[in-house]
Amino acid sequence: MQLIKRSGNVSLWTRGQELVNESFPELVEKMSHIKDDFVLDGELLVWNFKEQIAFDFSLLQKRINRKSPTRSIQIKYPIIFIAYDLLEINGRDIREIKLENRRIELEKYFSKWQNKTENNISDIFKICDLIFPKDWPDALTYKEKSRENNTEGLIIKKKNSIYSFGRKKGIWWKYKVDPMQLDAVLIYAKGGSGRRAGLYTDYSFALWKDKELIKFASAYSGLTNIEIKELDKWIRKNTIEKFGPVRSLKPEMVFEISFEKIQISNRHKSGIAVRFPRITKWRKDKKINDADSLENAYELMKKIS
């Protein structure tokens, strides 16, 4: 996200270029009292102030999808903006200077803003922590602790890097925790859109509960174009029922599904929800009886909690 203040006006933009001021009025109001103009790159999180860690990412959706949240909602889902980088200050574009120098500027202004007692921003704004591993094994230790903090891993940045748009290789690197995985049975397919129009590319997967298959996740990414076309042909030949654009399928295909997080969910029949599910392998070597169960999913959840 980018948090911007220019000429007295504060705006909060998502990565998808959506203005979300109305969803987070407390942040906009607090930052409007800062006298400096700025452009900050960062992340918005629902924050556990007692433990000083993020709550699960899914809770942020309860704020983003709600305009003009009531005071009770703001208290129930308290947010914080964590600044990663300072891109502009008082009209001066500093994206071309080294990251380590931008960090010095960020820390200087954060200290200045924080010391304004009439506008304490510490309850809604902070800057990200820096870590300096002594070697790769040490970095691995930090990475593995990320899941305990409800984060996906580390971002490694060159100290002399500029701030640029797009995916620039060799400047910043995401060092993410290894995904969790379950083998699941394909039970539904839905037609794609855009370049994938005319092909079945959106899939739903199930896990066993006793002798019944219960849907637990949907995914649309991970297969190669050749695999998509091969699976599309199979889907058309093995449809049980049609529900508008959705087809119910013979339970014969097993896929390895990877995801970043698993948690209890009362909204789903399975009782669980996963974050960022995607297909990582078509398990043609497995029969549906080899697929994982909901019991396996709950065991996985206990292991990481």
Whereabouts are the PLM-identified features?
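Catalytic cores of nucleic-acid ligases and guanylyltransferases
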Residues: 1-201, 206-305
